[in-house]
Each structure stands twice: as structure tokens, then as C-alpha cells.
């Protein structure tokens, strides 16, 4: 039991050291070695409990920044960590089932047929694919993210996303385990292959990864000739925020935008405000053709409010919204030291409200063009579980009564593209870059339209101040780096208390604001004309591994049920 606890702890500690805050990336190539050692223990050993406990500690420590968002987030933080801690246990259980059977001849035949490094990589990537989709999905701390600061090794993400990087890492871990087991420990393993077989397989994959990475990083890109100002500050926000505080935040960012233009030696084409910072107590409102006045707007003591009256009121609010935005634009133009005929466009995180057959509210992005008109909006497609949406909150009154206001947002359904003069941008919001499939699917959908046109860059607006400069902010950044490679597009991130950063299409950080720093980044993204294989076909290769893994889990569950039934019959 002590040996199992030590091995489980070693796995958790090494994996934790490979990522933020220490970020010793190369350690990830040996992080799974203790896990593979656990896979060899006898069936009667109690390996699951210590492994789960160590995995739980790893996730609690890695995601501890979540608890700062709200007192109620302690339970979701623990629940999410408890859920994610299951995956290493499932990995070992599947690996043992696939490589160890009662019939030794069959086991040997299996080992001769498929190298362990490939079996382990398929299982691990399959489990990563499952957690990217199950329970709304989360990509944070995939194995491949540990190499985010080693650009040459992550370029294969444009072939298969972070899954491809994780696949290679697992293969190298198995090769290290086989070599250590055979030549250092000097004993025959019940699950591992000949060390030469795994070393050749993993070495070949690693060399191919490096060659492909070197070639990809030298691909030609061209300047867009455009400058995008990314605002970054650390304005404290709370769930139950009053309108006065929202207006204070708006005023602060408004002054930042004006100062950013004044300090620039080049013409600013657009200024990007972080998530929610452009609302200022006044969301952008629209109405639909099938407009129905909501019941909460009706006053029993007065005449019923008619749809035409509501439409007029919304149009009045739209004028107020644009007047406010135009005042910021006029001030930016007046402060500019560079001659310009038009002010910068504004891309801002802002609440969206639509009145149609029912009222809908979204966390969104607005684009006010250089002429002061509303040119486009984006409604967030992926809501934060427990942060923006809670399962059954509308069905169970006792849940609805204890959660703070604002946790009932609606979900957008499609990507958008903002075609500014000379540059096209695809907006993403909040943690959407931390759920890899969201931006990749958006790119795929844009590429699959009747008149396909991909954006020149992805602009992401986020508010990570909730996490108090913890490692969660760094995890978010690493997700964005891998997304940049997977989509082959620069990522321009404007954040409140988070990663305000300019990332190129090779996943390299060109410029980043330090944690706690209030400043602006003048991003001049380069145009990368490549359309990655990952964007073209999506994650179906990893999906096949996920399907195979699900079949394995289903078969293990079936066998467990049969054993229980057999024991109950005997009893």
C-alpha cells in the first residue's frame, strides 16, 4: 500500500510541476511512468484508492483558483476536481484490462500485435476526448498543454489538436517506462513491450514531431498592416454588481481606450475591451419580428404595454448605447497623434438582450464600426457551468433560490466574423478558448459555408479577475496557445485580470501583460493563409479513440455486473 501511495503521489507531483506555476514542461515526458508501474500490480492490490486520492489532490491544487470567484464556488471546485480525478483511474483500469488477461498466451499475442505505447496513447487520448465533450466539456490541463512553451513540439496541433501532442507524450512515457523497467530495474514486465519496440515507435514519433514543427514554424506569413489595441486591466467584479459599479468600470476602460490611442505612434484600427467591460449598465438590445411583451413588464394598474411601444423603447436604448460608444470614439480620434479620417472601431464584451416571443439574454461581443454604427454581435456559444448556467436551475426552486442573479444566460448557436477594413476577426468569449472544440468548430463552420471565408485572427475577450492571478489564468493562456496552432490563426486576447496577450499562428507569445499589470498591447497580427487539417476535418480521429475507449469502459462495466451477478447467485 505504501508503494502504491508513493507511485500515485509521484505521478501527481511530477504532472503538477510540468504545468503552471512551475511550468517545467519536459517533466511531462516522465509523468506517466509511475502510472504505468501501477498498471503492473496484482489484481488483488488496492491501487484505485491511493491513485484517486493523489489525482484528486492534483486537480484541487491545479484548479484552486476557481474558489475565489464566489463563496458558492467551493462546491463546484471540489466536484469538478473529484470528477476529473476519475480519469487516471480509468486509464489504468483500461490499460490493465487490455494488456492483462487470464490467458497468458492471449496476453502475449496482444502485446506482439499492438505496441503498448500505441495502446496507452489511444486510451489516454480517448479519455481526453471524452472529457472535452462530457458534462459540457473542459480542455484545461490536457497533457499536451505542458509543452505550450516549446513551440517546435506543438506544431502538430494543426493536424490533430492538443490530442496529437498528448498522443506523442504518452508514447514517450511508455518508452521511458519500458527502458527503465528492462535496463535499470532489470526485470520482465507483465504489461510492457520490448524496450526497443517502444523506443523506436516513440523516438520515430518524436523526431517526426520535431521535423514537422521546424518546417511549420518557418511557413511564410504576411503583414495585415493593421493595429489592434488590446486593453488589459484588473477591475474587481462581483456577481451581484450594481449599475454604479458597472458605470465606474466602463469609465475606467473608456479612459484607457482614449489613452491607448493617444500613446500610439501608429493608426489604431480597433480597440478591444474585455468581457463585460463595455456594458456599463446598458446592454445592447434588439427585438424580433414575433415580438411579445414579457409579463414582468406589464403593470396590472396600467394599460397593457403593446409590442410597438416595447419596440420603440428598445430603439431608444439602442440610440443611447450608440451615442455613448460614439462619444468614446470621438474622444479617441481627438486624442490621436496620427492623422486619421475615422476613429478606431470598438470590439467590446457586452451583455446582449433580445425581445422576441420570449426575452433572451446573452453574454456577448459587440462591434461598433469606424462610422459609429453597430456592425455585428456575437452571442457566447459555450456557457460556464456553475458560473453562467446551472443544471436544473429553472426546474428546482431550491437551487434557484440560493444562486446569485445572472446565472440564467442563454446560449448562442453559431460563430460570427467581424470584417473590418482590411482584416477579418472571429470573436470568442471567456473560456471558449479553454474548450478547444469551440473555436475549432467555429473555424470549421465558417470554412464549410457556401461562401467560405476564414478570419485573419481570433479575438478573444475574457474576464479572469475572478481567479485572483492564480495558475488558472496561465492554464487559460496555454489553451489559447494550442488553439492558435490548431486553427493556424493569431489569437488576440483582451482580458480583465487575465491573459491579455498577442499569440502568433505558431502558438508563440509575441507580447503579454504581466499578471496584475494595467496596460495595452498594440497587436499587429500577421496573416497566415494555411487552413489546418484540424479545421478541415475536426477532431474525428480523437473521436474514434474516444469511441473505442467508451466501448472498453462499457465492456468493463458489463464484466463487473456479470461478476456481481455470479457472486450473488452463488451466495
UniProtKB/Swiss-Prot annotation:
<dbReference type="GO" id="GO:0016410">
    <property type="term" value="F:N-acyltransferase activity"/>
</dbReference>
<feature type="transmembrane region" description="Helical">
    <location>
        <begin position="118"/>
        <end position="138"/>
    </location>
</feature>
<dbReference type="InterPro" id="IPR036526">
    <property type="entry name" value="C-N_Hydrolase_sf"/>
</dbReference>
<dbReference type="InterPro" id="IPR004563">
    <property type="entry name" value="Apolipo_AcylTrfase"/>
</dbReference>
<keyword id="KW-0997">Cell inner membrane</keyword>
<feature type="active site" description="Proton acceptor">
    <location>
        <position position="275"/>
    </location>
</feature>
<keyword id="KW-0812">Transmembrane</keyword>
<feature type="transmembrane region" description="Helical">
    <location>
        <begin position="72"/>
        <end position="92"/>
    </location>
</feature>
<feature type="active site">
    <location>
        <position position="380"/>
    </location>
</feature>
<feature type="active site" description="Nucleophile">
    <location>
        <position position="430"/>
    </location>
</feature>
<dbReference type="GO" id="GO:0042158">
    <property type="term" value="P:lipoprotein biosynthetic process"/>
</dbReference>
<feature type="transmembrane region" description="Helical">
    <location>
        <begin position="51"/>
        <end position="68"/>
    </location>
</feature>
<dbReference type="Pfam" id="PF00795">
    <property type="entry name" value="CN_hydrolase"/>
</dbReference>
<keyword id="KW-0472">Membrane</keyword>
<keyword id="KW-0012">Acyltransferase</keyword>
<dbReference type="GO" id="GO:0005886">
    <property type="term" value="C:plasma membrane"/>
</dbReference>
<keyword id="KW-1133">Transmembrane helix</keyword>
<feature type="transmembrane region" description="Helical">
    <location>
        <begin position="542"/>
        <end position="562"/>
    </location>
</feature>
<protein>
    <recommendedName>
        <fullName>Apolipoprotein N-acyltransferase</fullName>
        <ecNumber>2.3.1.269</ecNumber>
    </recommendedName>
</protein>
<feature type="transmembrane region" description="Helical">
    <location>
        <begin position="13"/>
        <end position="33"/>
    </location>
</feature>
<comment type="function">
    <text>Catalyzes the phospholipid dependent N-acylation of the N-terminal cysteine of apolipoprotein, the last step in lipoprotein maturation.</text>
</comment>
<dbReference type="InterPro" id="IPR003010">
    <property type="entry name" value="C-N_Hydrolase"/>
</dbReference>
<feature type="domain" description="CN hydrolase">
    <location>
        <begin position="234"/>
        <end position="527"/>
    </location>
</feature>
<comment type="similarity">
    <text>Belongs to the CN hydrolase family. Apolipoprotein N-acyltransferase subfamily.</text>
</comment>
<keyword id="KW-1003">Cell membrane</keyword>
<comment type="pathway">
    <text>Protein modification; lipoprotein biosynthesis (N-acyl transfer).</text>
</comment>
<dbReference type="InterPro" id="IPR045378">
    <property type="entry name" value="LNT_N"/>
</dbReference>
<feature type="transmembrane region" description="Helical">
    <location>
        <begin position="199"/>
        <end position="219"/>
    </location>
</feature>
<dbReference type="Pfam" id="PF20154">
    <property type="entry name" value="LNT_N"/>
</dbReference>
<keyword id="KW-0808">Transferase</keyword>
<feature type="transmembrane region" description="Helical">
    <location>
        <begin position="152"/>
        <end position="172"/>
    </location>
</feature>
Amino acid at each position: 500500500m505504501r508503494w502504491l501511495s508513493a507511485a500515485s503521489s509521484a505521478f501527481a507531483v511530477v504532472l503538477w510541476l510540468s504545468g503552471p506555476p512551475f511550468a517545467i514542461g519536459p517533466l511531462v515526458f516522465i509523468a506517466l511512468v509511475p502510472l504505468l508501474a501501477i498498471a503492473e500490480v496484482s489484481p488483488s492490490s488496492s491501487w484505485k484508492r491511493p491513485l484517486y486520492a493523489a489525482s484528486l489532490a492534483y486537480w484541487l491544487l491545479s484548479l484552486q483558483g476557481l474558489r475565489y470567484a464566489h463563496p458558492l464556488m467551493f462546491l463546484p471546485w471540489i466536484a469538478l476536481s473529484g470528477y476529473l480525478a476519475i480519469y487516471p483511474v480509468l486509464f489504468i483500469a483500461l490499460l490493465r484490462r487490455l494488456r492483462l488477461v487470464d490467458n497468458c498466451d492471449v496476453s502475449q499475442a496482444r502485446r506482439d500485435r499492438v505496441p503498448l505505447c500505441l495502446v496507452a496513447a489511444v486510451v489516454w487520448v480517448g479519455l481526453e476526448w471524452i472529457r472535452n465533450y462530457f458534462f459540457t466539456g473542459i480542455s484545461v490541463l490536457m497533457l499536451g498543454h505542458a509543452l505550450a512553451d516549446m513551440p517546435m513540439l506543438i506544431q502538430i496541433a494543426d493536424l490533430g489538436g492538443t490530442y496529437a501532442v498528448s498522443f506523442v507524450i504518452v508514447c514517450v512515457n511508455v518508452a521511458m517506462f519500458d527502458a527503465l523497467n528492462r535496463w535499470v530495474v532489470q526485470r520482465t514486465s507483465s504489461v510492457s513491450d520490448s524496450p526497443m519496440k517502444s523506443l523506436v515507435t516513440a523516438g520515430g514519433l518524436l523526431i517526426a514531431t520535431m521535423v514537422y514543427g521546424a518546417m511549420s514554424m518557418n511557413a511564410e506569413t504576411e503583414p495585415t498592416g493593421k493595429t489592434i489595441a488590446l486593453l488589459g486591466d484588473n477591475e474587481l467584479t462581483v456577481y451581484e454588481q450594481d449599475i454604479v459599479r458597472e458605470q465606474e468600470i466602463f469609465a475606467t476602460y473608456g479612459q484607457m481606450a482614449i489613452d491607448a490611442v493617444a500613446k500610439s505612434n501608429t493608426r489604431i484600427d480597433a480597440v478591444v475591451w474585455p468581457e463585460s467591460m463595455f456594458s456599463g449598465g446598458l446592454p445592447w438590445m434588439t427585438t424580433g419580428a414575433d415580438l411579445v411583451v414579457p409579463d414582468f413588464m406589464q403593470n396590472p394598474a396600467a394599460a397593457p404595454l403593446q409590442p410597438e411601444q416595447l419596440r420603440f423603447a428598445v430603439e431608444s436604448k439602442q440610440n443611447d448605447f450608440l451615442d455613448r460608444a460614439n462619444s468614446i470614439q470621438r474622444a479617441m480620434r481627438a486624442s490621436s497623434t496620427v492623422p486619421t479620417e475615422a476613429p478606431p472601431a470598438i470590439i467590446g464584451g457586452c451583455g446582449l438582450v433580445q425581445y422576441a416571443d420570449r426575452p433572451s439574454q446573452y453574454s456577448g461581443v459587440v462591434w461598433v464600426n469606424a462610422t459609429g454604427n453597430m456592425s455585428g454581435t456575437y452571442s457566447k456559444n459555450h456557457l460556464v457551468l456553475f458560473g453562467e448556467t446551472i443544471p436544473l436551475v429553472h426546474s428546482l426552486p431550491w437551487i434557484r433560490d440560493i444562486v446569485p442573479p445572472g446565472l440564467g444566460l442563454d446560449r448562442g448557436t453559431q460563430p460570427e466574423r467581424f470584417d473590418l477594413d482590411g482584416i477579418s476577426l472571429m470573436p470568442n468569449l471567456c473560456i471558449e478558448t479553454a474548450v478547444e472544440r469551440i473555436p475549432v468548430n467555429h473555424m470549421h463552420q465558417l470554412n464549410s459555408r457556401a461562401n467560405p471565408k476564414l478570419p485573419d485572427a481570433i479575438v478573444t475577450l475574457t474576464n479572469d479577475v475572478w481567479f485572483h492571478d492564480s495558475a488558472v489564468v496561465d492554464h487559460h493562456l496555454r489553451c489559447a496557445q494550442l488553439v492558435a496552432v490548431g486553427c493556424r490563426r493569431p489569437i488576440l486576447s483582451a482580458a480583465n485580470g487575465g491573459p491579455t496577450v498577442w499569440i502568433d499562428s505558431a502558438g508563440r507569445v509575441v507580447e503579454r501583460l504581466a499578471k496584475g499589470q494595467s496596460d495595452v498591447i498594440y497587436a499587429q497580427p500577421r496573416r497566415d493563409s494555411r487552413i489546418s487539417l484540424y479545421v478541415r476535418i475536426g477532431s474525428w480521429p480523437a473521436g474514434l479513440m474516444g469511441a473505442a475507449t467508451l466501448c472498453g469502459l462499457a465492456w468493463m462495466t458489463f464484466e463487473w455486473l456479470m461478476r456481481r451477478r455470479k457472486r450473488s447467485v452463488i451466495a
